[in-house]
Regions:
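Active-site-facing substrate-recognition patch
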Residues: 1-64
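Short Gly/Thr/Asp-enriched flexible loops that form oxyanion-binding sites at enzyme active sites
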Residues: 76-85, 152
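Short, glycine/charge-rich flexible loops or terminal/linker lids adjacent to PRPP-binding catalytic cores
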Residues: 88-135
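Gly/Ser/Thr-rich loops at beta-strand to alpha-helix junctions
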Residues: 71-77, 143-144
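Acidic, divalent-metal-coordinating active-site segment for phosphoryl/phosphodiester hydrolysis
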Residues: 139-152
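Short glycine-rich phosphate-binding loop at a beta-alpha junction
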Residues: 64-71
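PRPP-dependent phosphoribosyltransferase catalytic core
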Residues: 2-11, 149-195
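Conserved acidic residues
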Residues: 65, 133, 163
């Protein structure tokens, strides 16, 4: 895979055209600091895009026994991939403990979109679905790897072995162990500083 640039110069544009294996979406640019803009990517509700990405990612997960994702943006993607692969179940890691959970397994982490540490949790009843299985981790965007690493820790704590990690997009840096379909660049403007 050719390595696309992770950082582009901000040129005043309001939108960025994302192309994922020939499928295009126009994303608004959002300013997140004085010199930085990000392309806002929200796949929730975009059935056509999710189906396209699932078809592209599914072949990389065919040797996995169980798929795992975190709520909420990964759910439609993993659901579609599970259907393609004929999996009747998949694991969703929740971002908080739920009263119905029995003996939950939890990992603390700080995603890029949060201001404080949160927990990623799976119900203890999922352990038999994970134990001694080959796990494929599915995410929409991988930036800092915090969420993906938390999912991997949950899978291994439950006795599974993570054999594949896939994402629609990466942002911020290339990750050798993650199969991805495209790059979501960060846009930077050079700030002139007065002496």
């Amino acid at each position: 895979m050719t390595q696309e640039p992770l950082i582009l110069e901000y040129d005043g544009r309001r939108f960025y055209e994302l192309s994922v294996r020939g499928f295009k979406r126009l994303l608004p640019l959002i300013q997140v600091s004085e010199d930085t803009w990000i392309a806002y990517f929200d796949s929730l509700g975009d059935k056509e895009f999710i189906e396209h990405c699932a078809r592209e990612l599914a072949p990389h997960l065919k040797d996995c026994d169980v798929l795992m994702t975190s709520e909420s943006k990964g759910i439609p993607l993993v659901h579609e991939i599970a259907g393609i692969l004929g999996h009747s179940r998949y694991i969703v890691c929740r971002k908080e403990r739920k009263p119905f959970m029995e003996n939950p397994i939890a990992v603390k982490f700080k995603p890029i979109t949060a201001t404080k540490e949160i927990e990623l949790v799976i119900d203890g009843r999922y352990i038999p679905l994970i134990k001694d299985k080959r796990i494929g981790i599915v995410d929409d965007i991988v930036s800092t790897r915090q969420t993906m690493e938390a999912m991997e820790k949950l899978a291994t704590t439950a006795g599974g072995k993570v054999t594949r990690k896939v994402a629609v997009l990466i942002e911020g840096e290339h990750h050798k162990d993650v199969i991805y379909l495209g790059v979501l660049p960060i846009f930077k403007k050079t700030i002139s500083r007065k002496p």
